[in-house]
Swiss-Prot record:
Pfam families in the cross-refs: Ribosomal_S6
The organism of origin for this protein: Cupriavidus necator (strain ATCC 17699 / DSM 428 / KCTC 22496 / NCIMB 10442 / H16 / Stanier 337)
UniProt GO molecular function: small ribosomal subunit rRNA binding; structural constituent of ribosome
Gene: rpsF
CDD domains (alphabetical): bS6 (cd00473)
Gene3D superfamilies: 3.30.70.60
Name used for this protein in its record: Small ribosomal subunit protein bS6
Amino acid sequence: MRHYEIVFIVHPDQSEQVPAMIERYKQLVTSQNGNVHRVEDWGRRQMAYMIQKLAKAHYVCLNIECGKETLAELEHAFKFNDAVLRHLIVQTKKAETAPSPMMKEVQREEARKAAQTTTEGQAA
């Protein structure tokens, strides 16, 4: 089995369905003797360029270990899901379990916002 990093972009109107989509894809991998090493929901972010007249979308990253048949089935699921705007599958040499640089940035932004609200609350 090989290791893969998958990033897919979901239509912003379908953001509330992202947890169910993640669960469905995780179940697909694990049901065929694969492993899910990391799941990161990066949230709604600004895209580099417009896709279908949309400037923002919901980003999700998965690090999995699976066979070629499972990967083909996942790719098929991405292609025929209208909510998935784009997907990228990259083969990696080993399982990545540490937070990605993107997730570290998201955590930094959340910490900064939390710090701002506490300082604003103290100032009032």
